[in-house]
Regions:
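Conserved N-terminal catalytic core of the sugar/cofactor nucleotidyltransferase
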Residues: 2-5, 13, 27, 31-103, ...
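Active-site metal-binding loops of divalent metal-dependent hydrolases
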Residues: 10, 105-106
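Short N-terminal binding/cap micro-motifs at the start of the first secondary-structure element
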Residues: 11-16, 132
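Short alpha-helical oligomerization interface
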Residues: 20-24
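A structural signal for short hydrophobic beta-strand segments in well-ordered beta-sheet cores
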Residues: 25, 137-139, 208
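Short internal beta-strands
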Residues: 50-54, 125, 283, 299
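Conserved core of the sugar-phosphate nucleotidyltransferase
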Residues: 107-183
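Left-handed beta-helix
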Residues: 178-324
């Protein structure tokens, strides 16, 4: 089974962190977002992947090749022309066998094997209160009748959350080719939902699959919430002398923590150093330094330094804050 994972986006909603690191390499619950995605795909039988890279793509390539042994093809999306365009660029890696498509800012907890047992293409959906930020699926007689990308007035609360099982990928590629050839865009981009709608209009049957465990990593507040949810299912942390742990927490074995209170809902990544601090509901990234601080609901970037802070902060890589 092959999965296509588009990760070419800039991740502007996660600034300042994404000035120096691609969104999918931001650490959450002990590993980068893309690491959680790859682990789940492999667990469910995916043995080939196409990673669509763009912004800071070499860093993503380096991480994948270092940590995963499955067959991986990298495709570069030089112009950000939409999700549909990203999938179309992957066409040479696609055979006639079914494929999975999963967006790179979505961590999921779903029974993919059950999803892929369908005789039809399947789109993962999640019921939301406000569907205007999403593609929306409208259902008739158990099948998807209409897909609308970020509608002003949604007629359904079934948000398409970025997990797709495509039974006939060559039909999808043909529809994407037609969209691009005729320059059909929605909100300025070639949308995957428009190609899927074209497939439906041509007679393709598609069903929905309820994704209960869907964790958005696209904004600081949702990233921290995802960190909290994933940590709740993590193994208990190893106790450390002089450190009070309030689970759930993740502390890398390569992190140094002294005379501090850590947790709940806190990740401290490899190489980080935390001393004389209280840190809760936060993510401390690789090689960051935190001392004499009380941090809550905060994200500290890689190689950043925070001293004397009693605040909620969101500080990017290689930055320094001192409050004395």
């Amino acid at each position: 089974m092959r999965a296509i994972v588009p990760v070419a986006g800039v991740g502007s909603r996660l600034r300042p962190h994404t000035y120096t690191v691609p969104k999918v390499l931001i650490n959450v619950a002990g590993k980068p977002i893309i690491g959680h995605i790859m682990d789940r795909l492999i667990e469910h039988g995916v043995d080939e992947a196409t990673i669509v890279i763009g912004y800071l793509g070499e860093k993503i390539r380096e991480y994948i090749l270092k940590n995963y042994q499955i067959k991986v093809d990298f495709v570069e999306q030089e112009e950000r022309l939409g999700l549909g365009h990203a999938i179309f660029l992957s066409r040479h890696t696609v055979s006639r066998d079914p494929i999975l498509i999963i967006l790179g800012d979505t961590i999921f907890d779903a029974d993919l094997k059950r999803m892929m047992s369908s005789n039809h293409s399947v789109l993962g959906v999640h019921k939301v209160e406000d569907a205007r930020r999403f593609g929306v699926a409208e259902i008739t007689d158990g099948f998807i009748a209409r897909l609308v990308e970020k509608p002003e007035n949604p007629k359904s609360n079934l948000a398409v959350v970025g997990l797709y099982y495509i039974k006939q990928p060559q039909v999808l590629i043909d529809c994407l080719k037609e969209l691009i050839k005729t320059n059909v865009r929605t909100k300025g981009e070639f949308q995957l939902t428009d190609a899927l709608q074209m497939m439906i209009d041509k007679g393709e049957k598609m069903k929905t699959f309820d994704i209960q465990g869907w964790y958005d990593c696209g904004k600081p507040e949702t990233l921290l919430e995802t960190n909290r949810i994933l940590l709740a299912n993590a193994a208990p942390p190893t106790t450390r002398k002089g450190v009070l742990l309030q689970p759930p927490v993740f502390i890398s074995p390569e992190a140094v923590v002294k005379n501090s209170v850590i947790g709940p809902n806190t990740t401290i990544a490899a190489g980080a150093e935390v001393e004389n601090a209280i840190v809760r509901n936060s993510i401390i990234s690789e090689d960051a330094r935190v001392s004499d601080a009380l941090l809550e609901d905060s994200i500290v970037g890689s190689n950043a330094v925070v001293r004397g802070s009693y605040k909620r902060i969101n500080i990017g890589d290689s930055s320094e804050l001192e409050f004395y």
